[in-house]
A protein has these predicted regions:
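Hydrophobic h-region of N-terminal signal peptides that target proteins for export
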Residues: 11-20
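Solvent-exposed, polar/charged alpha-helical surfaces in well-ordered, non-transmembrane soluble domains
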Residues: 52, 56, 98, 102, ...
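Surface-exposed amphipathic alpha-helical segments
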Residues: 58, 158-207
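Compositionally biased, proline/threonine/alanine/serine-rich low-complexity intrinsically disordered stretches
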Residues: 21-41, 77, 86-91, 98, ...
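N-terminal "mature-domain start" segment
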Residues: 25-65
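Soluble non-cytosolic domains of exported or imported proteins
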Residues: 45-49, 90-99, 168-179
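Bacterial N-terminal signal peptides that target proteins for export
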Residues: 1-7
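Conserved polar/disulfide-associated segments of primarily extracytoplasmic proteins
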Residues: 22, 60-154, 160-161
Length: 207
């Protein structure tokens, strides 16, 4: 059985020193490309906007600190995006990676067993054109074989964490779709052209 580490809180306080960052409450812009309807989510980072295309047909709900996404008809599957504003630049070095690895294992459900780090990948998906690091962990919980991934990136003064959890049999396809959506995330500087888009996107999403 996995024991939750009592040092995780210290790690997060010292290694991942951060404060509230991007507001992940989404505005929504619907558009059609090649006959297919898509949704673009627009977040706010001070005067800049951040644009993100979620995987097709995934539902979502956002708050200031977190965006949650769920694929259709998949039990035990969920993705989240978190953004924190960094007090100072933090390189993606082994100290940070090991701290996040401990955090990821500590976050597993109580009673989880057989946790194993399956992969550690550098730059598996660029985030806003910059470097990233990915951890993939397998484990068993609630009678299911599950896989959890975390993609971490420091972009400008923001630390981003993209998590995905799914059954082992569902993970590969969902992981591919989620990483493709991560690739779409990018910052947009203030301009008249983009401010028009942002105004249109203030309409609430039809759920």
């Amino acid at each position: 059985m996995i024991r939750r580490s009592t040092i995780v809180g210290v790690i997060l306080a010292t290694v991942i020193s951060a404060k509230a960052g991007i507001d992940l409450t989404p505005s929504v812009n619907d558009y059609v490309s090649e006959g297919i309807r898509y949704q673009k989510l627009i977040f706010h980072d001070d005067k800049r906007s951040v644009e993100y295309n979620p995987p097709a047909n995934w539902t979502y709900a956002g708050s200031a600190g977190q965006l949650r996404l769920s694929p259709p008809k998949k039990s035990f599957a969920e993705a989240t995006i978190e953004a924190m504003s960094l007090d100072k630049p933090q390189p993606l070095d082994q100290t940070l990676v090991k701290a996040v690895e401990q955090r990821l294992i500590a976050e597993l459900p109580p009673g989880s067993q057989f946790a194993k780090v399956e992969q550690e990948l550098e730059n598996s998906v660029p985030v806003n054109g910059g470097p990233s690091f990915e951890l993939i962990i397998s484990y068993q919980a609630m009678g299911e074989k599950l896989v959890k991934s975390l993609v971490m990136a420091n972009v400008r003064d923001t630390q981003l964490m993209f998590r995905l959890t799914a059954r082992k049999d569902d993970f590969e396809a969902l992981h591919r779709d989620f990483k493709a959506s991560i690739f779409s995330l990018h910052w947009v500087e203030p301009s008249e052209g983009h401010s028009g888009i942002a105004k249109e996107a203030q309409q609430p999403a039809a759920r």
